[in-house]
Amino acid sequence: MGLDPLTGTLLILARPGDIDGDTGREAIAARLTAIAGVPVEVRTWSEMDANLAVEGGGRVVGSDAEEARRFVCTSGFVVTDGTLSALTTAAHCPDTLNFIDHDGTAIPLTLLGAWGAHRQDVQIHAVPMPLAAAFQSDVEDRARAVTSWRNRASTRVGDIVCHRGQRTGYSCALVRFVDFAPAGDLCAGPCPATWVAVDGPKCRGGDSGGPVFLGNVAFGLVKGDSTSRGTCALYYYMSIDYLPPGWTLSYTR
């Protein structure tokens, strides 16, 4: 569910199996319009909204105790508590992770905390080395410095943002919603309408936790996606201002 501020229309995303074709969609839209008092549009999107699966080749690698197979996510931004610098990724990634360097070296990370409920999907890891306030963006072998950030209240529908994922690389697209509520119990229960959704165009398992940015400005961390017929319809991210208390983005002044 999301609100289009350009038209004032409330957009409801329904799974195809939950409604009876075009007739059912129009009937539901009319009923909800009468209840809400604003225009409502019902669209069929994907059969499932999901946290991006942690799989495929990537930079942050780990496994859960219950499963033997390896999972892969994408590292996000460097954060600090005022004393320690640490690395972020998504909370739904494994707790035990290794950072994979350019030469293939596995660097063990130490979990400092994970926040995976409601409006948050982030975990923070200590790294046994100094960390620069930088991230991979369009060029894999050259880091980009972080110089500022954009919070959710300052993000607008139609803004351009970019993201980098270990499975899909670098891509940019328009913000579709700034108050998106993913379907299902992906937020340790129903998700609040605090997620920012972007029009793809690329998202796959393994992109979870990756940085969302524009130039040197940090926007957030990738949480999940909504796909249609195997195509990335949109992905959504946690805004950087929802980092846990005591932690802030590291940036170059």
Question: Whereabouts are the PLM-identified features?
Answer:
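Catalytic nucleophile loop of clan PA
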Residues: P201-L221
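Short, low-order "capping/linker" segments at domain edges
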Residues: D49-F71
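A generic structural motif
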Residues: L10-L13, L87-T89, D121-V127, A193-G200
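Serine endopeptidase catalytic core focused on the charge-relay Asp
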Residues: E66-G184, F213-G215, K223, L249
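Soluble, acidic/polar mature domains that operate outside membranes
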Residues: I35-A53
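Short amphipathic alpha-helices in soluble, non-transmembrane regions
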Residues: T23-A36
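Short glycine/threonine-rich beta-strand-turn micro-motifs
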Residues: M1-R25
